[in-house]
Design a protein with these regions (language model features):
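Extended, histidine- and acidic-residue-enriched regions that form the cofactor-binding/catalytic faces
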Residues: 1-128
Length: 128
C-alpha cells in the first residue's frame, strides 16, 4: 500500500516529507512517498511562458496569473472575474484575464502539465 503526499503549499512541504520518512522508518507494508514535483511552481510558470508566451512581472502580491488561470478553469467564480472587470482590475501581474476563455484555456493546459509531471514523479518514486 502506497501513501502519497502531495500539496501546493510551500509551508506544508517539509511536514509531508517528514511524514513519509516516518512512515517508511516504521517498516510494515505501507510505504510513504513525498512528491515535491507537484509543487514545482517554477516549472508551471516556465511551461506557461514556453507554451503561451505569457510572462508575468510581480506586482508584489501573493498572486500569479498561472494560479488564477488554473482556478478559473475549475471555477471562474473563484477569481472574481466579473468584480475585477467592473473595478477595472482584470489583470494579474500585468497579464489580462480578459477574455475569460483565455485564462481558462491556459489553466486547463497548466493543470494537464502539472498532472503529467506529478504522475511521472510518482511512477519514478515507485520504481515503475
Amino acid at each position: 500500500e502506497w501513501i502519497i503526499y502531495i500539496g501546493d503549499s510551500g509551508g506544508n512541504q517539509t511536514g509531508m516529507e517528514n511524514a513519509a520518512n516516518r512512515l517508511n522508518a516504521e517498516g510494515g507494508s505501507r510505504k510513504g512517498l513525498f512528491i515535491p514535483e507537484f509543487y514545482d511552481n517554477a516549472g508551471v510558470q516556465q511551461h506557461m511562458e514556453e507554451t503561451f508566451g505569457i510572462y508575468e512581472e510581480s506586482e508584489g502580491w501573493h498572486d500569479n496569473y498561472w494560479l488564477s488561470a488554473m482556478q478559473a478553469a475549475v471555477d471562474p467564480e473563484t477569481v472574481r472575474y466579473e468584480e475585477r472587470v467592473q473595478a477595472g482590475r482584470a489583470s494579474i501581474n500585468g497579464v489580462s484575464l480578459v477574455p475569460l476563455g483565455r485564462p481558462i484555456a491556459v489553466g486547463e493546459e497548466l493543470m494537464n502539465w502539472r498532472t503529467d509531471h506529478t504522475i511521472a514523479a510518482i511512477r519514478a518514486a515507485m520504481g515503475m
